Structure formats: structure tokens, C-alpha cells
Swiss-Prot record:
Homohexamer. It catalyses: Couples ATP hydrolysis with the unwinding of duplex DNA at the replication fork by translocating in the 5'-3' direction. This creates two antiparallel DNA single strands (ssDNA). The leading ssDNA polymer is the template for DNA polymerase III holoenzyme which synthesizes a continuous strand; ATP + H2O = ADP + phosphate + H(+). It comes from the Eukaryota. It comes from Porphyra purpurea. Belongs to the helicase family. DnaB subfamily. CDD domains: DnaB_C (cd00984), Hint (cd00081). ATP binds at G187, R188, P189, S190, M191, G192, K193, T194. GO terms for biological process: DNA replication, synthesis of primer; intein-mediated protein splicing. This is Probable replicative DNA helicase. A replicative DNA helicase, it participates in initiation and elongation during chromosome replication. Travels ahead of the DNA replisome, separating dsDNA into templates for DNA synthesis. A processive ATP-dependent 5'-3' DNA helicase it has DNA-dependent ATPase activity. The intein is an endonuclease. The keyword ATP-binding applies. InterPro entries: DNA_heli_DnaB-like_N_sf, DNA_helicase_DnaB, DNA_helicase_DnaB-like_C, DNA_helicase_DnaB-like_N, DNA_helicase_N/primase_C, Hint_dom_C, Hint_dom_N, Hint_dom_sf.
């Protein structure tokens, strides 16, 4: 069958692996077929026999007659789909049997069962699940056909594929939370991040049939339920906790509890959890028929990384990347709450910037920063609103825009990177550099990486502290020559706004974890810092990043007693 000419045959070959075959002889023949398959013509029998003979596989299979017998008894190619389905089905069954054996061994073992052991077994089940999913590589014709059908359906019934938050101004900007998007809700403590997420959750589970799961790494399930009941019953959560309730209030709680109990909402309050465990738990729920449509994680900084890194900053970078990959794999939005860098507390203007969403990456105090066509070292830098050079990746140009905020940090180990043209920069391991491979941390740079630099400015030994340069608009790429440990020294944290990157020693640097996010929403309440404000209950919602749409700012009313946000 596999040596007959068929377009369907070539499509099915992409879905099958040699490991799917039970008999070794079939696996060896199929592996040889994969090596000789021609996407234009049918699989040539002569080429197949030559490949088997070259790899000394004919002897392993027994004799040439065995192969000829397989060919003679092969059915027509028009039923290739049914045969491939049988092969896949039997392979999945063997995987399930293997998982069952593993469970039996674990159950009979005297060793303590750990979460990692359970995760390992669950991973075997998810592999079986993924094999049955119809995923692959598609042509543009197939993609456009699917897209046009989807758009036509939306046009006819006037629906949006996004998941709406219930805050009309936010939904107007975002058009709903989209599938495969990583959404970060950020703010300093006491801004109401968890309350905001609960508001969104309540709206979704009450107005749709969507399943939502919330991974709470900070609050227990009981604490979260008290908050939800407080919002639903319009009662202070502290009053619910104390139990000092009137008969009317108690009856209200009972009625709302009955309604909430029937909604499609799951809470997981595991203290330590990683992206891998989240993936397994969501896929197991899907296997049970629970079509999870939204994942909420409270909050980012408490997530664990399966592969331990040298420092927490590197772990967070890996976690956000893993979350984005998970959102794409599960084809759903993931909403993650995140703390902002505490350095903004030292600024006069406490309104958060996109660059505050990071673990601090620092650079040497001797680094020269480009500012209004002038370069100054950090230790001689005076902050003022002026033009600072940023890199705009959309037009691939260096522009004069933005302002900066600097804070002095403790001593840290720095590394010196140097290009072939002798450009250099001293920075901590978690600071990011723009390369042809995208933004890369210092500890992830490779020799011969192409580093993005600016054109038109060179450090001058004669003008050490103040260097004039000509205006520039283009950037250049230079080869990374070496990276060495430099010194244990005082460093500075440098934040840029509105684009979270800047130019130091001619090299474009960046230290934000927001690069993996599709949507970044920041919460800010001026009255938290200014107690004399009249509108003390107003919270500013800042859409600071929107990969697929506009930015925007609007206000919501915050009820501190109920920890509840309201449209205005």
C-alpha cells in the first residue's frame, strides 16, 4: 500500500512514526520508507529495497521474500486513512497499558509518592491524548479556507471569538481575551489585582458556558470563596469570615452559594506549582470533558520552574516563555497576575510603566546612555523629561522619544560583552540584549551572536564623559566576540518609557519580562499614595501593551469594603 501513488498516502505518512508500529519488522520497513519517500512521485520500490539493503535491514527482517510478501498483500491506497487510524489507536492503547503498569508499580512501592511522580505518569497520558489530536503543518490554502469560514460565521451571527471581561471599556479596547494570548495584569500590592481577576471570572462563568480554572498560589480556596461571596452578596469579606451575620445575610449567602456551586469554575490552591503541572491538570480536565476556556494564575512570581536556574530572574523569564507556549498549545487565553518592580516606589511619579514589569537587570555605572544625541555615564546622569533614544522594533529604527528613571542598586556580579568592533557593555546576567535571534539575556548569549548596535556614534577616549553625536535612524549588526566575568560592583537599574529599551555603549538593551505577553494591563490608584485625593475610590486601568490592537486608559470604581470593581 505504501508503494502505491496516492496524495492521501503522503498526508498520512506525516502523522505516523516508526515507533507507532508494534512489530519491529514493520517499524524498520516504515523507517526506510520515510528515508526514501518522494513528495512528487510515488514511493519507488527499487529505492526502498536499496535503502533496506544499504542499512543491512533485509537480513534483520529475515529475507527478501518477507518484504515482497508484505508488498503483495498490501491493500489499496484509498483506505490508507483507516489503516493509519488503526495503527494510531493500537499505539495509544499500548501507551495506556504502560501508564497502568507504572501506576501499579507506584501503588505497590514503599517509597513516598511525590508530585513529580504523579506528574510523570500524567504526562504519559497527555502524550496519548496529543497523538489523537489532529495537528500538523498546513498549506496557505488550508489556512485561508479555515480563516474565511471562521470570519463568515462571525459575520453571519455577529459574535466575537474573544472572551469578554465584563468591563465594557476594556472589552472595547481588547475585543475580548483572544485564544493563545498571554495576558498579564500587573500592579503594586493593594491595587486590587486579585479582586480584578475575580471580577472577570465572575462575569465569564455567569454569562457563558465556558469553564474557567484559577490557580491560586497565594490565597487558599476558602479565602477566594469568601471574596467571591462578598462580591456576589454585597457583604464585607471580614464580616463573612467572622460569622457575625444576620438571618437575612445568611440566607443571601446560602442562595448565592447554590448558584455558584453549579457554575463551571475550578480552583486549585496548590502551594508550589509549575507550568508543566498546570498543563497536565488542564489536559486531564479536558479528558474528562471539561472544556477549559480560560486559565487564571495568581500570581506569576510564585510560580515554580521545572528546570531550576541560577537565579530567580532567569526563572521568571523561562516561566513567561513557558506560559506563552502553553497558551498556544492549549489554544486558550492565560491570564497571569504579576507584581511590579518595587523600584517605582522610589520615583516621584508612581504611575506604573511597562518597564516596571520585570526583575531588575542592571548595568555598570560607567555605561554611557544615549540622551538627546548626547552620551552620559550613569553616575553623572541627571533625570529630566527629554528625548531618549529607543529602538522601535515595528519599523526597525532608532528614535528620539521617552523618559528614563534610574535607581542605584547593591553590588552585583557583572559580565562584559564585547563585539568584534570593540563595542562593550558591563551588565548583570539577566539583562537582555537585542540580537538577530530576538531579545536574549546576557547569560543566554552565544559567541558569534549578531548584536544590534546603533550607527553614527562611537565612544571617544578624548571625550570620556560627554560625547556629541550626529542624529541617526538606522541600526547595525555586529558579531559578539566574547563574554567574560567583569567585576563585583555597584550597578544601576535603568527604566525607560514608553518603549522598555535604551542604548548603552552603542548596544540596544532591554530588561522587561513583558516581551512574551500579548496584552499587559496595569492597575494604578493615585489615592493609595496621595491620601488627600477626593476621588479616592477611582482606579486607573492602563492597557500598556496590546500586540494585536490599540492601547488605552480608563477608570473603574473600586469598592474597598467588597474588594469589587465597577464600571463608571
Amino acid at each position: 500500500m505504501l508503494t502505491q501513488e496516492s496524495e492521501d498516502l503522503l498526508k498520512q505518512i506525516e502523522k505516523l512514526s516508526p515507533d507507532f508500529f508494534y512489530f519491529k519488522s514493520n517499524s524498520l520497513v516504515y523507517r526506510a520508507i520515510l528515508e526514501t519517500v518522494n513528495p512528487i512521485d510515488k514511493i519507488a520500490l527499487v529505492s526502498l529495497l536499496t535503502a533496506l539493503n544499504t542499512n543491512n535491514l533485509i537480513r534483520q527482517l529475515g529475507r527478501l521474500e518477507t518484504i515482497m510478501k508484505l508488498i503483495e498483500n498490501s491493500p489499496a491506497s484509498n483506505i490508507i486513512y483507516e489503516y493509519s487510524k488503526v495503527i494510531l489507536d493500537n499505539y495509544v492503547k499500548r501507551l495506556l497499558l504502560k501508564s497502568g503498569d507504572s501506576l501499579c508499580l507506584i501503588s505497590c512501592s514503599k517509597k513516598q509518592i511525590t508530585q513529580s511522580v504523579i506528574t510523570s505518569v500524567a504526562s504519559q497520558l497527555t502524550i496519548a491524548y496529543e497523538i489523537l489530536e489532529d495537528e500538523g503543518t498546513y498549506t496557505l490554502a488550508e489556512i485561508f479556507a479555515s480563516l474565511l469560514v471562521s470570519l463568515d460565521t462571525k459575520k453571519k451571527i455577529s459574535i466575537n471569538s474573544g472572551i469578554f471581561s465584563g468591563f465594557w471599556q476594556l472589552d472595547l479596547i481588547t475585543n475580548g481575551f483572544q485564544k493563545s494570548d498571554l495576558i498579564i495584569i500587573a500592579g503594586r500590592p493593594s491595587m486590587g489585582k486579585t479582586a480584578f481577576a475575580i471580577n472577570i471570572t465572575r462575569h465569564i462563568i455567569k454569562t457563558s458556558q465556558y469553564y474557567v480554572i484559577l490557580f491560586s498560589l497565594e490565597m487558599s480556596t476558602e479565602q477566594l470563596l469568601r471574596r467571591i461571596l462578598a462580591q456576589e452578596c454585597h457583604l464585607n469579606s471580614q464580616k463573612i469570615q467572622s460569622g457575625q451575620l444576620t438571618n437575612v445575610e445568611w440566607q443571601r449567602i446560602v442562595e448565592e452559594s447554590k448558584i455558584l456551586a453549579n457554575l463551571n469554575f475550578y480552583i486549585d490552591d496548590s502551594a508550589e506549582i509549575s507550568c508543566d503541572i498546570i498543563k497536565v491538570k488542564v489536559k486531564l480536565l479536558r479528558l474528562q470533558g471539561k472544556k477549559i476556556k480560560l486559565i487564571i494564575i495568581d500570581y506569576l512570581q510564585l510560580l515554580q520552574e521545572s528546570k531550576k536556574s541560577e537565579n530567580r530572574s532567569q526563572e521568571l523569564s523561562l516561566i513567561t516563555r513557558s506560559l506563552k507556549i502553553l497558551a498556544r498549545e492549549l489554544n486558550l487565553p492565560i491570564l497571569v497576575l504579576s507584581q511590579l518592580n518595587r523600584n517605582l516606589e522610589s520615583r516621584h511619579n508612581k504611575r506604573p510603566l511597562l518597564s516596571d514589569l520585570r526583575e531588575s537587570g542592571c548595568i555598570s555605572k560607567f555605561s554611557h546612555i544615549m540622551w538627546s544625541h548626547v552620551s552620559k555615564p550613569l553616575f553623572n546622569f541627571s533625570i529630566k523629561k527629554s528625548h531618549m533614544h529607543n529602538f522601535n522594533k515595528n519599523i526597525y529604527q532608532l528614535l528620539d522619544q521617552g523618559e528614563a528613571f534610574i535607581s542605584r542598586q547593591d553590588k552585583k556580579t557583572t559580565y562584559k560583552i564585547r563585539t568584534n568592533s570593540e563595542k562593550y557593555l558591563e551588565l548583570t546576567s539577566n539583562h537582555k540584549i537585542l540580537t538577530l535571534r530576538g531579545w536574549q539575556r546576557c547569560d543566554q548569549l552565544l559567541c558569534n551572536d549578531m548584536i544590534t548596535t546603533q550607527i553614527g556614534f562611537e565612544l571617544s577616549r578624548k571625550k570620556k564623559y560627554l560625547l556629541n553625536c550626529i542624529p541617526f535612524s538606522l541600526c547595525n549588526f555586529e558579531t559578539l566576540a566574547n563574554i567574560n566575568i567583569s567585576n563585583f560592583q555597584n550597578v544601576f537599574d535603568f527604566a525607560a518609557n514608553p518603549i522598555p529599551n535604551f542604548i548603552a555603549n552603542n548596544i540596544i538593551v532591554h530588561n522587561s519580562i513583558e516581551q512574551d505577553a500579548d496584552l499587559v494591563i496595569m492597575l494604578y490608584r493615585e489615592s493609595y499614595y496621595n491620601k488627600e485625593m477626593e476621588m479616592e475610590d477611582m482606579t486607573e486601568i492602563i492597557v500598556a501593551k496590546h500586540r494585536n490592537g490599540p492601547l488605552g486608559t480608563f477608570q473603574l470604581k473600586f469598592d474597598a469594603n467588597l474588594a469589587n470593581f465597577l464600571n463608571v
